């Protein structure tokens, strides 16, 4: 053992260095968030729970082009459509199996009228798998609930689309 190692052990420099690091870290700003009481802000591009949007007049936006169904890599979307009296096509059935969904956002990008959008909600835990099978009514209800925030996020994201 050399003299330097003996002095280092006697003066407890390693211990003092570790104690200094512990004290310094104690007063550093916390990196964690006390979820669910605190939440970090979400990006306008955040992809969460799916929604079907309506026009301001109340009519649903979906024109039953089925592009979202065709582009979905997980095959989580099922659409059935019928023509209306005025000749326009509208969906009679629009289902998303959220268990299959991989939240890639392809359905949102493919939609020509911004009818299907992945909204800001990420807290949609359920007790059964059946509750993760979203039908048209539930998707429209999600759209009605989150419309203001979705419209704002789409406006913020517009320069990049």
Curated annotation (Swiss-Prot):
This is NADH-quinone oxidoreductase subunit I. It holds the Pfam family Fer4_7. PROSITE patterns: 4FE4S_FER_1, 4FE4S_FER_2. One of its GO terms (molecular function) is NADH:ubiquinone reductase (non-electrogenic) activity. InterPro entries: 4Fe4S_Fe-S-bd (IPR017896), 4Fe4S_Fe_S_CS (IPR017900), NADH_quinone_OxRdtase_chainI (IPR010226). [4Fe-4S] cluster 1 binds at residues 62, 65, 68, 111. Its cofactor is [4Fe-4S] cluster. NDH-1 is composed of 14 different subunits. Subunits NuoA, H, J, K, L, M, N constitute the membrane sector of the complex. NDH-1 shuttles electrons from NADH, via FMN and iron-sulfur (Fe-S) centers, to quinones in the respiratory chain. The immediate electron acceptor for the enzyme in this species is believed to be ubiquinone. Couples the redox reaction to proton translocation (for every two electrons transferred, four hydrogen ions are translocated across the cytoplasmic membrane), and thus conserves the redox energy in a proton gradient. Residues 53-82, 92-121 form the 4Fe-4S ferredoxin-type domain. It catalyses: a quinone + NADH + 5 H(+)(in) = a quinol + NAD(+) + 4 H(+)(out). Belongs to the complex I 23 kDa subunit family. GO terms for biological process: aerobic respiration. It comes from the Bacteria. It is found in: Cell inner membrane. Its EC number is 7.1.1.-. GO terms for cellular component: plasma membrane. [4Fe-4S] cluster 2 binds at residues 72, 101, 104, 107. Binds 2 [4Fe-4S] clusters per subunit. Its main location: membrane. It is an enzyme of class 7 (translocase). Keywords: 4Fe-4S, Cell inner membrane, Cell membrane, Iron, Iron-sulfur, Membrane, Metal-binding, NAD, Quinone, Repeat, Translocase, Ubiquinone. It comes from Hyphomonas neptunium (strain ATCC 15444). The keyword Iron applies. It is a peripheral membrane protein.
């Amino acid at each position: 053992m050399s003299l330097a190692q003996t002095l280092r052990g006697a003066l407890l420099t390693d211990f003092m260095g570790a104690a200094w690091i512990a004290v310094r870290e104690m007063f550093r700003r916390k990196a964690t968030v006390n979820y669910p009481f605190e939440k970090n802000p979400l990006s306008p591009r955040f992809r969460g729970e799916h929604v079907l949007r309506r026009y301001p007049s109340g009519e649903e936006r979906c024109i039953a082009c089925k592009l979202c169904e065709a582009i979905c890599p997980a095959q989580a979307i099922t659409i059935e459509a019928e023509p209306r009296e005025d000749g326009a096509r509208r969906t009679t059935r629009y289902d998303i199996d959220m268990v299959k969904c991989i939240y890639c956002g392809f359905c949102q990008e493919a939609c020509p009228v911004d009818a299907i959008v992945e909204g800001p909600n990420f807290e949609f835990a359920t007790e059964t798998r059946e509750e993760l099978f979203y039908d048209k009514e539930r998707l429209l209800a999600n759209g009605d609930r989150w419309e203001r925030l979705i419209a704002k996020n789409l406006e913020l994201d517009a320069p990049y689309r």
